[in-house]
Amino acid sequence: MLPAYLPNNFAALTGGGMPIDMGRNWTDGRRILGDGKTIRGFVGGVTAGILIGAVQMYAEISGLVPWFPPHTLTAVILLAIGSLLGDMVKSFFKRRQGIDRGGEWFLVDQLDFVVGALLLTLLFDPIWMLNTMTIPLLIVILVLTPLLHRTVNIIGYKLGLKKVPW
């Protein structure tokens, strides 16, 4: 899941510049996504996800981590892209709900990227997904991700890397 976990962090670190929505508003007069979703951040986040996935694949192939499930390059790319697409879909709906950038949306903020990553991977690499993601593993991911997400965000907040701890 590292190719899905890292892109959001690296999107924030590498972001800035042109927003993906090009500053446009939806029919409700609110921004489609907002200034926090940028082209540079998307590219940086996906790149980081693919790089960590490549490192994982190397570690798996060379026998350094025999307990890791085998990854395919396709799955790594889909997990990384799906992670950021899930985050963008969440941002779209947050704007529709009137929740500003940085505003908290409990559990949705913690699971959006995982759901996006898993759904995109299921759609385009179903064989890998069905062979790798067992029901017990999915339950562990869905339970531990919010805790991990919150912990990492609190650390980022305390280090001054995030404006809010969620």
Swiss-Prot record:
Pfam family, one: CarS-like
Record's keyword terms, sorted: Cell membrane, Lipid biosynthesis, Lipid metabolism, Magnesium, Membrane, Phospholipid biosynthesis, Phospholipid metabolism, Transferase, Transmembrane, Transmembrane helix
Molecular function GO terms recorded: CDP-2,3-bis-(O-geranylgeranyl)-sn-glycerol synthase activity
Subcellular localization: Cell membrane
Keyword Membrane included in the entry's annotation: yes
Main location as per UniProt: membrane
Transmembrane segments: 39-59, 61-81, 104-124, 127-147
Cystine crosslinks: none
Enzyme Commission number(s): 2.7.7.67
Catalytic activity: 2,3-bis-O-(geranylgeranyl)-sn-glycerol 1-phosphate + CTP + H(+) = CDP-2,3-bis-O-(geranylgeranyl)-sn-glycerol + diphosphate
A GO BP entry: glycerophospholipid biosynthetic process
Co-factor requirement: Mg(2+)
One annotated Gene Ontology cellular component of this protein: plasma membrane
Broad enzyme group: transferase
Domain of life where this protein originates: Archaea
Membrane topology recorded in Swiss-Prot or TrEMBL: Multi-pass membrane protein
Pathway(s) the chain acts in: Membrane lipid metabolism; glycerophospholipid metabolism
NCBIfam families in alphabetical order: PRK04032.1
Primary role: Catalyzes the formation of CDP-2,3-bis-(O-geranylgeranyl)-sn-glycerol (CDP-archaeol) from 2,3-bis-(O-geranylgeranyl)-sn-glycerol 1-phosphate (DGGGP) and CTP. This reaction is the third ether-bond-formation step in the biosynthesis of archaeal membrane lipids.
Family: Belongs to the CDP-archaeol synthase family.
Name of this chain's protein: CDP-archaeol synthase
Organism this protein belongs to: Methanospirillum hungatei JF-1 (strain ATCC 27890 / DSM 864 / NBRC 100397 / JF-1)
Species classification: Archaea, Methanobacteriati, Methanobacteriota, Stenosarchaea group, Methanomicrobia
The gene coding this protein: carS
